[in-house]
């Protein structure tokens, strides 16, 4: 039985991970959980899974969590109560919990970086749904992986598809991820993208895009931030950078293809020009399960793919004019160093500002480009962890300042 630690247990990835544990009680058990502020859901997860340790990102909520657990009926209250920890140190405890065999990282954004590093330094294998860890800190993470022997297993559908395709090659032993060197025999990666909420919109129509529009994904059920990233295609741009670090390919050999049906999750072209693809319904539980069961596969009762039901699979090239975030991501990846960290942080902040309706959808790439341009003179080619954390905070502030300037300008214009 494999012992699982879940970072971000109340989020989309975390809840799906725990659902898998419930589907396979003879294969997995939960030993550690971390969460943000959703105490009601967390309490129910503790009741059901009885972990050894639980961490809250906000240490101030620990007393309330303990009170809620103590108030449970005696027949449903875990005995003994889990060890409760809080703050960044608490997240590190969950990430490096001694009995955990696999750490599932479902914390959204750069907030997942430090606990992911803690897990790596503890020698844990990781199921990585937090793509920002490699994007922002690839030059920091790869040496730590080499030092500890940890393995990163991709829990997002696209990189899981690539990983699964490579398991069928003679060099699959070298495709265990995150060595930072090219995977032998791998010529090209094609990352498929649904096109997001605006795939059937014209570039001109995006002027009137609302938050509700951007957070309505046609195929996948995801959190708001990543759904907006899908609408802007930034999610795919970030995945290009992640694929570069995971599989060692140059950016010129990692392509994005719009595939509206979201049935092919990605493709690899091998040295002999063969192309391998992984197919399945758009369901995040499949790549998460593969991470959890790897190198084995578990039989599931889940819905099986019927291509006659799908009818057709279509593909088209993405329009750079409609998706400017895509080119920004390629440029940041090629610049390397601290630039991907700036790109990632600026995007996180710009999306947050959009979700609060402080900026328009088309302002998101403008804010990101502004931060990246400002950072060019200060780019660190070989960053350490402190460099990454510093530029992360700087980029967020740079976006906030752009938003504030724009607000003041709009206010002055209206007054005139």
From Swiss-Prot:
Concerning Pfam families, the annotation shows: DXP_redisom_C (PF08436), DXP_reductoisom (PF02670), DXPR_C (PF13288)
Q: Which InterPro entries match?
A: DXP_reductoisomerase (IPR003821), DXP_reductoisomerase_C (IPR013644), DXP_reductoisomerase_N (IPR013512), DXPR_C (IPR026877), DXPR_C_sf (IPR036169), NAD(P)-bd_dom_sf (IPR036291)
**Record: residues binding NADPH:** 10-13, 36-38, 130, 132, 223
Q: Name the top EC class.
A: oxidoreductase
Q: Where is Mn(2+) annotated to bind?
A: 156, 158, 239
Q: Which residues bind 1-deoxy-D-xylulose 5-phosphate?
A: 131, 157-158, 194, 217, 230, 235-236, 239
Task: List cofactor names only.
Answer: Mg(2+); Mn(2+)
Q: What is its EC number?
A: 1.1.1.267
Q: Which GO terms describe its molecular function?
A: 1-deoxy-D-xylulose-5-phosphate reductoisomerase activity; manganese ion binding; NADPH binding
Could you state one GO biological process linked to this protein? isopentenyl diphosphate biosynthetic process, methylerythritol 4-phosphate pathway involved in terpenoid biosynthetic process
- Disulfide pattern: none
Q: Which reaction does it catalyse?
A: 2-C-methyl-D-erythritol 4-phosphate + NADP(+) = 1-deoxy-D-xylulose 5-phosphate + NADPH + H(+)
Kindly list any coiled-coil regions of this protein. none
Please name the pathway: Isoprenoid biosynthesis; isopentenyl diphosphate biosynthesis via DXP pathway; isopentenyl diphosphate from 1-deoxy-D-xylulose 5-phosphate: step 1/6
Q: What does this protein do?
A: Catalyzes the NADPH-dependent rearrangement and reduction of 1-deoxy-D-xylulose-5-phosphate (DXP) to 2-C-methyl-D-erythritol 4-phosphate (MEP).
| Annotated HAMAP family | DXP_reductoisom
Question: Which protein family is named in the record?
Answer: Belongs to the DXR family.
Its protein name is: 1-deoxy-D-xylulose 5-phosphate reductoisomerase
Q: Please name the source species.
A: Synechococcus sp. (strain CC9311)
